[in-house]
């Protein structure tokens, strides 16, 4: 028997599940367009779908932010219908044998920084920056990286006055320990700087294949968090970025130098990584490591056409320079 949501969407296969509930694919019964549907039990002890739907509404219209098409309660479930996206960067990382090239890391970093800056501009911090929460799109948006999962997001300043939340200590760790900033481990209230620092660890994870504080043995969750914190604090930025370009050292040192209420200089960070991109002679052609592995034949063809166009332009520029 076909299950329908809002008498408009036919529920299909299950895509996954999380602490909040389950995610399904659904089709519009008229247009046959596919969507993602999040289901959360109305009896959930820690409901987050209502909060998340409000966040999506606030962030609505932003590049790389999924659009919500319907939210409501039906039967025993709170339901949210939103854009169906492609795999996460974590999925693609696994697909690429758990190592990304420098070019792919820099192209993803550029987009991820843009997404984080946009969320911050709307007065919220994400508080769970990790590869699983960045997804590529589908079809025409296959090269666009989206930011998702705002269940842990928090307002860090007043919308009108821009008064920042107060500095606090003794907070429990919110987010994912692997990528959490050192200040988050120390129990300090999170602010913009922590999202940016977490991104730095994500980038090093992509470049190295793993982080030094992964796979630590522990007897409890608290013990594991403590061991991750100890290892993170004792591993210098220089050691963490040993085989990487100095720009990554600069990036992380900058993040750690920020004060609680500071607005990160997103433009400076983008320029820092863009300069490295240019110095390496890369072309921003949206050909990621996963492109040929994941993309459909149609998408592949489109990307190769783009690459040929870029190559022809580069060849022409080279000829022009030689002729001058």
UniProtKB/Swiss-Prot annotation:
One of its GO terms (cellular component) is microneme. Its cofactor is Mg(2+). Keywords: ATP-binding, Cytoplasm, Cytoplasmic vesicle, Kinase, Magnesium, Metal-binding, Nucleotide-binding, Secreted, Serine/threonine-protein kinase, Transferase. It is an enzyme of class 2 (transferase). Its EC number is 2.7.11.1. GO terms for molecular function: ATP binding; metal ion binding; protein serine kinase activity; protein serine/threonine kinase activity. SUPFAM superfamilies: Protein kinase-like (PK-like). Belongs to the protein kinase superfamily. CK1 Ser/Thr protein kinase family. Casein kinase I subfamily. Serine/threonine-protein kinase likely to be involved in many cellular processes. Phosphorylates rhoptry protein RON3, nucleosome assembly protein NAPL and DNA/RNA-binding protein ALBA4 in vitro. GO terms for biological process: peptidyl-serine phosphorylation; peptidyl-threonine phosphorylation. It catalyses: L-seryl-[protein] + ATP = O-phospho-L-seryl-[protein] + ADP + H(+); L-threonyl-[protein] + ATP = O-phospho-L-threonyl-[protein] + ADP + H(+). Interacts with rhoptry protein RON3; the interaction is direct. Interacts with CK2alpha; the interaction is direct. Interacts with nucleosome assembly protein NAPL. Interacts with RAB5b. Interacts with host GAPVD1. Interacts with host SNX22. It comes from the Eukaryota. It holds the Pfam family Pkinase. Its main location: cytoplasm. It comes from Plasmodium falciparum (isolate 3D7). It is found in: Cytoplasm; Cytoplasmic vesicle, Secretory vesicle, Microneme; Secreted; Host cell surface. This is Casein kinase I. Gene3D superfamilies: Transferase(Phosphotransferase) domain 1. ATP binds at residues 15-23, 38. Residues 9-278 form the Protein kinase domain. The active site is at 128 (proton acceptor).
């Amino acid at each position: 028997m076909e299950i329908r949501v809002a008498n408009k969407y036919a529920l299909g296969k299950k895509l996954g599940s999380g602490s909040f509930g389950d995610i399904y694919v659904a089709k519009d019964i008229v247009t046959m367009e596919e969507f993602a549907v999040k289901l959360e039990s109305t009896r959930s002890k820690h409901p987050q779908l209502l909060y998340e739907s409000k966040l999506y509404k606030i962030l609505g219209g932003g590049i790389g932010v999924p659009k919500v098409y319907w939210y409501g309660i039906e039967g025993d479930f709170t339901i949210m219908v939103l854009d169906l996206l492609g795999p996460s960067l974590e999925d693609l990382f696994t697909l690429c044998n758990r190592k990304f090239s420098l070019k792919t890391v820099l192209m993803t970093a550029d987009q991820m920084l843009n997404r984080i800056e946009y969320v911050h501009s709307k007065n919220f911090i994400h508080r769970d920056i990790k590869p699983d929460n960045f997804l590529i799109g589908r079809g025409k948006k296959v090269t666009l990286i989206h930011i998702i999962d705002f269940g842990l997001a928090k307002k860090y300043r007043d919308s009108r006055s821009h008064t920042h939340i107060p500095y606090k200590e003794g907070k429990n760790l919110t987010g994912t320990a692997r990528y959490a900033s050192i200040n988050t481990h120390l129990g300090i209230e999170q602010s913009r700087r922590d999202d940016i620092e977490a991104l730095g660890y994500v980038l090093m994870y992509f470049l190295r294949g793993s982080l030094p504080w992964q796979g630590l043995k522990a007897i409890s969750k608290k013990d594991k968090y403590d061991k991750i914190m100890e290892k993170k604090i004792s591993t210098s930025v220089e050691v963490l970025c040993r085989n990487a370009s100095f720009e990554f050292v600069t990036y992380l040192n900058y993040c750690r130098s920020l004060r609680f209420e500071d607005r990160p200089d997103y433009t400076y960070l983008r320029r820092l990584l863009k300069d490295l991109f240019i110095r390496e002679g890369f072309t921003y052609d949206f050909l990621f490591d996963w492109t040929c592995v994941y993309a459909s034949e149609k998408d592949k063809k489109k990307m190769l056409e783009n690459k040929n166009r870029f190559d022809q332009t580069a060849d022409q520029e080279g000829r022009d320079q030689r002729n001058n």
